């Protein structure tokens, strides 16, 4: 398909088609073309949401694969099956290569096009949060100096987003709430700081609760969903019996204004 010749509107439409067909790699390609054609202006809310959906689905499949393979690897190591462990490590490496390529792709797009062209506080927070998310995904599987670098870059991006969000966005704004949710997950999972994670999540939840009556009808569903996820994580993190492996830490969902997914 000669998609290089498509107009901005046609690429957006093709991205929607690809989403309906669950062909997310192609959805990424269409939305990257859109993003690279708007150096002097911002993406629309719809466009940035489509880009976010595309990448979140592409990365989400690999993150799930990595977690499953890593779990199997631990079990085989426990059984002393070294031959199988060697096979699993090679396979895990293949998934990690794919994860790295995906993260590098969106991070480059964010740094060269999306963050520099953003002017509205909402879009700045959206893209800086996204930048933090993809550095966090790198920190999930990288080791040594690479993990340290990814974690530091995550912190810088989330902190920059937080500074703008606290100054410019209402406590009930779904993008501000989604940032608090994912930032707290970063503290818990990557930095191993449960106290800081709980503090951040609780503050965001409490501030939003106190201003619930100011919620607009259009963002009510998104905001209350993320607030529920914040509360779920707080319950999980503060419980002494939270070691059930079936329990899953919640991140901003695939369909909300904070991630646009």
Swiss-Prot record:
One of its GO terms (cellular component) is cytoplasm. Signal peptide: none annotated. PROSITE patterns: 1433_1, 1433_2. Pfam families: 14-3-3 (PF00244). One of its GO terms (biological process) is signal transduction. It comes from the Eukaryota. Disulfide bonds: none annotated. InterPro entries: 14-3-3, 14-3-3_CS, 14-3-3_dom_sf, 14-3-3_domain. GO terms for molecular function: DNA binding; protein-containing complex binding. Belongs to the 14-3-3 family. Is associated with a DNA binding complex to bind to the G box, a well-characterized cis-acting DNA regulatory element found in plant genes. This is 14-3-3-like protein GF14-6. It comes from Zea mays. The lineage of its organism: Eukaryota, Viridiplantae, Streptophyta, Embryophyta, Tracheophyta.
């Amino acid at each position: 398909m000669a998609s290089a010749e498509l107009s901005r509107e046609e690429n957006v439409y093709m991205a929607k088609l690809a989403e309906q067909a669950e062909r997310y790699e192609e959805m990424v390609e269409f939305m990257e073309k859109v993003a690279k054609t708007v150096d002097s202006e911002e993406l629309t809310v719809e466009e940035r949401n489509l880009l976010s959906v595309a990448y979140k689905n592409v990365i989400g499949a690999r993150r799930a694969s990595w977690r499953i393979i890593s779990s199997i690897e631990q079990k085989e190591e426990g059984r002393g099956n070294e031959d199988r462990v060697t096979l699993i490590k090679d396979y895990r490496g293949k998934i990690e290569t794919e994860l790295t390529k995906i993260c590098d792709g969106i991070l480059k797009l964010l740094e060269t096009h999306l963050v520099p062209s953003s002017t509205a506080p909402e879009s700045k927070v959206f893209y800086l949060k996204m930048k933090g998310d993809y550095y966090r995904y790198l920190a999930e599987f990288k080791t040594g100096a690479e993990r340290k670098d990814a974690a530091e870059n995550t912190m810088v991006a989330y902190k920059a987003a937080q500074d703008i969000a606290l100054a410019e966005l209402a406590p009930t704004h779904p993008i501000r709430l989604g940032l608090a949710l994912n930032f707290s997950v970063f503290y818990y999972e990557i930095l191993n700081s449960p106290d800081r994670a709980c503090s951040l999540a609780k503050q965001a939840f409490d501030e939003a609760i106190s201003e619930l009556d100011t919620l607009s009808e259009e963002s009510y569903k998104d905001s209350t969903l993320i607030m529920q996820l914040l509360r779920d994580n707080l319950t999980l993190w503060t419980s002494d019996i939270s070691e059930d492996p079936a329990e899953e830490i919640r991140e901003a969902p695939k369909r909300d204004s904070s991630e646009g997914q």
